[in-house]
């Protein structure tokens, strides 16, 4: 594979576009808030006013426990017939990559003088990360969560409440992540002066996709240093799961201009042909959702369809603008795996390595198992293990017909 075009630090353009994707499709009432956010991000992140970056990286080091290890999975490597490394985001504080972005944005909110932070959450991981970041930085925290997800993720709801957040269940629509985002946007429109909207993935109107990518880039930066130290060369393949896309763009970004194959693994649910899936890149159309032009799951009338996945974090009917763009460019390969394949991979990693992966990350693992057939024993594959699976044990037990 040869990279004919540079992608790193080239996008988005001044209008927040990645090719045709992205932009700012928001009501007039939110435009001042978006402009204020853009200006603040430029001041504090890009121009590093008040040593913002140093403060952020110190929090990542001392509070999150970064860098997370790059772990050589010896028994999994033997099983698959190639060298397999796991980027252990499951070992970050709170058990997922979500805290990287939550801390970055909460710190930005504080510098902007906002007192109140709102967020949406699906699996609950972003909600927990936001609640923790707000507790750490002394900010009021409100979390919107689809009523179905509240039911699926009771443990995370209680974790958020323990950290002082108020969790508001959303009963409209499909009662999942999409509806939680809608509700959070309504709140922001009403309380724009005092409130910061902390978006959980590389989605939404500009500058969010760029901001989230920048805060998650640390994954790929560490990964590049670590693999060079361990192997003396870059990996052949990096595999990451994709819901909205933040862990994937975080892992991929540093490698966009390198000769490394990048696989974005979506939720195939009960199979693409059934319509019960969350695979917008593999089976979606271009549309507008939550403030940006992206690949979405929609029906023949252009209406957004409900997504489905056994994993709450992949249960979203769209994918961020940068990944949408990179798919069209042929720079990433979009693939999907079913619930059943993810469950198999979940059990495989538990059995071979004693590591309990999140169901989201199990999708990346499941595709890695398939991909290994095409790799040689000296080929290096890195799987971004985006989170740990404690939150999913009940879901897995139920799917396997076990009472706990």
From Swiss-Prot:
Pathway: Amino-acid biosynthesis; L-tryptophan biosynthesis; L-tryptophan from chorismate: step 5/5. One of its GO terms (molecular function) is tryptophan synthase activity. Pfam families: PALP (PF00291). Transmembrane segments: none annotated. One of its GO terms (biological process) is L-tryptophan biosynthetic process. It catalyses: (1S,2R)-1-C-(indol-3-yl)glycerol 3-phosphate + L-serine = D-glyceraldehyde 3-phosphate + L-tryptophan + H2O. Its cofactor is pyridoxal 5'-phosphate. Its EC number is 4.2.1.20. InterPro entries: Trp_synth_b_CS, Trp_synth_beta, Trp_synth_beta/beta-like, TrpB-like_PALP, TrpB-like_PALP_sf. Keywords: Amino-acid biosynthesis, Aromatic amino acid biosynthesis, Lyase, Pyridoxal phosphate, Tryptophan biosynthesis. The beta subunit is responsible for the synthesis of L-tryptophan from indole and L-serine. Belongs to the TrpB family. This is Tryptophan synthase beta chain. It comes from Methanocaldococcus jannaschii (strain ATCC 43067 / DSM 2661 / JAL-1 / JCM 10045 / NBRC 100440). The lineage of its organism: Archaea, Methanobacteriati, Methanobacteriota, Methanomada group, Methanococci. The gene is trpB.
């Amino acid at each position: 594979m040869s990279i004919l075009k540079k992608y790193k630090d080239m996008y988005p353009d001044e209008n927040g576009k990645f090719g045709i994707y992205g932009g700012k499709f928001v009501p007039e009432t939110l435009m001042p808030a978006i402009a204020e956010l853009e200006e603040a991000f430029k001041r504090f992140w890009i121009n590093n006013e008040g040593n913002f970056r140093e403060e952020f990286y110190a929090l990542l080091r001392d509070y999150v426990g970064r860098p997370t290890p790059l772990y050589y999975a010896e028994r999994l490597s033997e099983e698959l017939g190639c060298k397999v490394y796991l980027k252990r985001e499951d070992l970050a504080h709170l058990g997922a990559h979500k805290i990287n972005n939550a801390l970055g944005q909460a710190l930005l909110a504080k510098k902007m003088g906002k007192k109140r932070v709102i967020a949406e959450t699906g699996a609950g991981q972003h909600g927990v990360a936001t609640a923790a970041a707000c507790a750490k930085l002394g900010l009021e925290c409100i979390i919107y969560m689809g009523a179905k997800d509240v039911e699926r993720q009771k443990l995370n709801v209680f974790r958020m409440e323990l950290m002082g957040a108020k969790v508001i269940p959303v009963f409209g629509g499909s009662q999942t992540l999409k509806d939680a985002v809608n509700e959070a946007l309504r709140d922001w429109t009403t309380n724009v002066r005092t409130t910061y909207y902390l978006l959980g993935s590389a989605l939404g109107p500009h500058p969010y996709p760029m901001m989230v990518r920048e805060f998650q880039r640390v994954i790929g930066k560490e990964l590049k240093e670590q693999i060079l130290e361990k192997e003396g060369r870059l990996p052949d393949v990096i595999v990451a799961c994709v819901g909205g896309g933040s862990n994937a763009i975080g892992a991929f970004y540093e490698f966009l201009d390198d000769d490394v194959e990048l696989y974005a693994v979506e939720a195939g649910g009960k199979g693409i042909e059934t319509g019960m899936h969350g695979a917008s890149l593999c089976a979606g159309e271009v549309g507008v959702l939550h403030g940006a032009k992206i690949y979405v799951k929609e029906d023949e009338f252009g209406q957004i369809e409900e997504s489905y996945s056994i994993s709450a974090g992949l249960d979203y009917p769209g994918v961020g603008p940068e990944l949408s763009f990179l798919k069209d460019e042929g720079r990433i390969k979009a693939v999907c795996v079913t619930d059943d394949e993810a469950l198999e991979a979940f059990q495989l990693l538990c059995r071979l390595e004693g590591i309990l992966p999140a169901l989201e990350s199990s999708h990346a693992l499941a595709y890695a198992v398939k991909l290994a057939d095409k790799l040689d024993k000296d080929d290096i594959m890195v799987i971004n293990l985006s989170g740990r699976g404690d939150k999913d044990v009940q879901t897995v037990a139920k799917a396997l017909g076990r009472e706990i």
